[in-house]
Amino acid sequence: MAVVAAAAATGSTTRSGGGGGEGTRSGRKKPPPPPLQERVPLGRRAAWAWRLAGLAVLLLLLALLALRLLRHHGGAGGDAGVWRVALVCEAWFAALCALNVSAKWSPVRFVTRPENLVAEGRTPSTTAAEYGELPAVDMLVTTADPALEPPLVTVNTVLSLLALDYPRAGERLACYVSDDGCSPLTCHALREAAGFAAAWVPFCRRYGVAVRAPFRYFSSSSSPESGGPADRKFLDDWTFMKDEYDKLVRRIKNTDERSLLRHGGGEFFAEFLNVERRNHPTIVKTRVSAVMTNAPIMLNMDCDMFVNNPQAVLHAMCLLLGFDDEASSGFVQAPQRFYDALKDDPFGNQMECFFKRFISGVQGVQGAFYAGTGCFHRRKAVYGVPPNFNGAEREDTIGSSSYKELHTRFGNSEELNESARNIIWDLSSKPMVDISSRIEVAKAVSACNYDIGTCWGQEVGWVYGSLTEDILTGQRIHAMGWRSVLMVTEPPAFMGSAPIGGPACLTQFKRWATGQSEIIISRNNPILATMFKRLKFRQCLAYLIVLGWPLRAPFELCYGLLGPYCILTNQSFLPKASEDGFSVPLALFISYNTYNFMEYMACGLSARAWWNNHRMQRIISVSAWTLAFLTVLLKSLGLSETVFEVTGKDKSMSDDDDNTDGADPGRFTFDSLPVFIPVTALAMLNIVAVTVGACRVAFGTAEGVPCAPGIGEFMCCGWLVLCFFPFVRGIVWGKGSYGIPWSVKLKASLLVAMFVTFCKRN
């Protein structure tokens, strides 16, 4: 693990100890300071309208379950087993619906007031420029693979962070980059970027640049017009910065990794390649930053995100400092937003409705989930300290019990223990005059074996043992009694790149689902955190919804197979159109989709976006979630191990977008990954079932069969064919990357043949 620290501006990275008012110095009572944030619940009428709509869907699901229990089976000659399978699946869907109603019951949003972020002992007459002693912030950036995450992507992220607006930024902001791939190219690119930052940061602040990632700024603005002396000065500076950035890009792109290893630092990189790669990136950055700058606030960022709102830190401080009780804001999470996002979200991974509806509802309980990037953490919360902690002992002697506990939790580094002690007990840290004096200490605490025998990775730092450590870490913080806040700003605080194409999207969803499944079956299950810790019950239910995504796979897959099975075996699992009970599943189908559609409309999204997300939910469930479920099942049986899969980032940030050649980025692409086999097979199976059923109806062979499939079964198959239409097109018309490979078609055909054979025997 290569770790690089950079100052936010030229000069040293001297730290001040953090904020804290001195109180009223005179006997005269001061007026209360203006609020830094405002809690805005959803209007009562709107809130109850959404609640009743959700309850209506839930009641229809319960009515369908009652219908199943009362009828017991599909009628004379019907297969009771089919109805039992349907009953189990529908019971699962009803449970998920109840959890969703609970999570969205009390939606809340917070409005920040950075203009009120003024000096200690704030008064209404204090100007907004007098910020006082705001806490320092350590900004932690993670990258893993120089091929999938090009160095220029990381460079733009770092440059945008260094240019953030913050009082005395050179003293209070520090940026750390950890490269889990230990790439000499990434380290070289950051060294090159350091010189460019000396000119870029002042340029951004002088002219109030809104978007401070150079690749985005120069790609979205043409050469400005000059209309006077001031404009002429800006034009000259703009041209100079554009030329310097172009030179930086060329230097980074033209660098050869082998030449870096041969000249200037080869031994250094060889050492890290052999040793440090095994380290855990986020934990390492936490320890390294602790012994170097030890800011009480940490910002965690993925390498493919950049600052889109230069006042993002000030907005975060409004939420971290704006509550009477620190427990109200253990961390502040910014929703994920994407630049150059494809219109109408064709791959269902922009998650706008999830943040606007689901997470705003969770905010009314214990707060937003930690999403892994764009999050401001209290270092105290990351260290596993409960809110409002008051240490019983504050002895300064090394032999005290408090120091012994620190050694047990944080390891044997005296410097790290001292920094942890200052954070835990809100003590002032000594300003760092020269961070180079801590380089050797930083190397020691970043060693591979440092956390052995300590609490790192369990009770301290980011939690080990899951591919979705972000959710697990956030849950642990909530379980200690902390709350969290979703920070919604205009413009959005950070922007990132969303994967495009079938392979990248489904790989990402599979990785998430695998990690979520591992949490569900581990001792970190949220149910245990509610029983034995301080995780609130409704927050636990919200976690179960997200962690239970992959568990939906077997139920949705079984339910999706019921329609083809019943058509192929001349049975039914839904009431006939002529029966009284037919209105229940029909009303459920209409009401659920209408409710879901109205959620997207309320979020300002289009009908096409709703449909794209709906169909992707069906595709993801049958493909990525199914494979994730099987992966974790095999791991629990000791037959396999999970592997972290890096998702490729948008290389337009690195100016390597020359290979578009007219391609349609919103169209589904395929490769030979196993994740495509289940959906391809189910799409084929539904087409076969509809064809067989239509032939029976046309030739009258289904007449006289009391339990023959009805319109409900045909609607289910037809609906799935519509949802899987990208795969149908890939099977029939697709060519190149838009066509499903023959290897996938053959494997899917074999599965279909096996299922049809099974149906004939039944």
Curated annotation (Swiss-Prot):
<feature type="transmembrane region" description="Helical">
    <location>
        <begin position="47"/>
        <end position="67"/>
    </location>
</feature>
<keyword id="KW-0328">Glycosyltransferase</keyword>
<feature type="active site">
    <location>
        <position position="180"/>
    </location>
</feature>
<feature type="compositionally biased region" description="Low complexity">
    <location>
        <begin position="1"/>
        <end position="15"/>
    </location>
</feature>
<feature type="transmembrane region" description="Helical">
    <location>
        <begin position="673"/>
        <end position="693"/>
    </location>
</feature>
<keyword id="KW-1133">Transmembrane helix</keyword>
<feature type="region of interest" description="Disordered">
    <location>
        <begin position="1"/>
        <end position="39"/>
    </location>
</feature>
<dbReference type="InterPro" id="IPR005150">
    <property type="entry name" value="Cellulose_synth"/>
</dbReference>
<keyword id="KW-0808">Transferase</keyword>
<feature type="transmembrane region" description="Helical">
    <location>
        <begin position="619"/>
        <end position="639"/>
    </location>
</feature>
<keyword id="KW-0472">Membrane</keyword>
<comment type="similarity">
    <text>Belongs to the glycosyltransferase 2 family. Plant cellulose synthase-like H subfamily.</text>
</comment>
<feature type="transmembrane region" description="Helical">
    <location>
        <begin position="541"/>
        <end position="561"/>
    </location>
</feature>
<feature type="active site">
    <location>
        <position position="470"/>
    </location>
</feature>
<keyword id="KW-0333">Golgi apparatus</keyword>
<dbReference type="GO" id="GO:0071669">
    <property type="term" value="P:plant-type cell wall organization or biogenesis"/>
</dbReference>
<dbReference type="Pfam" id="PF03552">
    <property type="entry name" value="Cellulose_synt"/>
</dbReference>
<dbReference type="GO" id="GO:0071555">
    <property type="term" value="P:cell wall organization"/>
</dbReference>
<keyword id="KW-0812">Transmembrane</keyword>
<feature type="transmembrane region" description="Helical">
    <location>
        <begin position="708"/>
        <end position="728"/>
    </location>
</feature>
<comment type="function">
    <text>Thought to be a Golgi-localized beta-glycan synthase that polymerize the backbones of noncellulosic polysaccharides (hemicelluloses) of plant cell wall.</text>
</comment>
<keyword id="KW-0961">Cell wall biogenesis/degradation</keyword>
<feature type="transmembrane region" description="Helical">
    <location>
        <begin position="739"/>
        <end position="759"/>
    </location>
</feature>
<dbReference type="GO" id="GO:0000139">
    <property type="term" value="C:Golgi membrane"/>
</dbReference>
<protein>
    <recommendedName>
        <fullName>Cellulose synthase-like protein H2</fullName>
        <ecNumber>2.4.1.-</ecNumber>
    </recommendedName>
</protein>
<feature type="transmembrane region" description="Helical">
    <location>
        <begin position="81"/>
        <end position="101"/>
    </location>
</feature>
<feature type="transmembrane region" description="Helical">
    <location>
        <begin position="582"/>
        <end position="602"/>
    </location>
</feature>
<dbReference type="GO" id="GO:0016760">
    <property type="term" value="F:cellulose synthase (UDP-forming) activity"/>
</dbReference>
<dbReference type="GO" id="GO:0030244">
    <property type="term" value="P:cellulose biosynthetic process"/>
</dbReference>
<dbReference type="InterPro" id="IPR029044">
    <property type="entry name" value="Nucleotide-diphossugar_trans"/>
</dbReference>
